[in-house]
Amino acid sequence: MKKEIRLLDVELRTPEDNDKMIVEGYAVTFNSPATHGYTEIINEHALDNTDMSDVPLKYNHEDSHLIMARTRNKSLELAKDEKGLFIRAELIDTQSNKDIYKSIKAGLIDKMSFAFTVRGDEYDYDTDTRTITDIDKLYDVSVVDMPFYDSTSVYARGENDEFLERRSELRKEHEEQMKEEERKARLKEAKDKLLKRLG
């Protein structure tokens, strides 16, 4: 399974707290179609069996940057609800976190993204829609300052090439199946005409 990354245009906010640097937002949203060459939807049960045992909050998914918060030490909380995966992080007191926090508060950073692997998905040939039904592991959630991506874009860095290849194969299989069904229909029509003449 290859790691995939998705960027979401969701609300990222800093609740008023005079003593702590708190960041909240949705890292994953359910049943919200995103289009990027094909339509993708994350099913509301996709996180039911996901490994979220040690999830860090990062900046732009960068490993070189200090981790901002983490579930392991309870500075990052994850809560699944009917909308998606809600995160609440208490940032530790470092200069880099202070800078990021100020940028979020000023609205300069207002996007979230998540890195994950897929265990189960479905593909609808007619609507060209991929539905992610089972996310295997959540590797990290990130606050990101990428240029604005609207609902027609996804930040994927090419990690979903494997799915795109499989999608092409599935489309080819579907087309072959349709041709076979069309051939059978023509044969049946010819047979019916012949029987009608003989009758």
Question: Over which residues does each language-model region extend?
Answer:
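Polar/acidic, low-complexity leader/linker segments enriched in S/T/G and N/D
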Residues: 1-54, 167-172, 184-189
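Short helix/loop capping segments that flank catalytic or ligand/cofactor-binding pockets
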Residues: 34-36, 67, 149-152
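Flexible loop/turn segments at secondary-structure boundaries
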Residues: 32-34, 65-66, 121-123
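A glycine-rich, hydrophobic loop/mini-helix early in the fold
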Residues: 52-89
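Short glycine-rich, polar/acidic loop-and-turn segments at beta strand-coil junctions
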Residues: 27-31, 61-63, 91-93
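Residue microenvironments linked to proteolytic maturation
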Residues: 9-15, 22, 74-173
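Charged/polar low-complexity intrinsically disordered segments, enriched in acidic residues
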Residues: 158-199
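A general structural signal for short secondary-structure boundary/capping elements
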Residues: 2-3, 28, 70-76, 135, ...
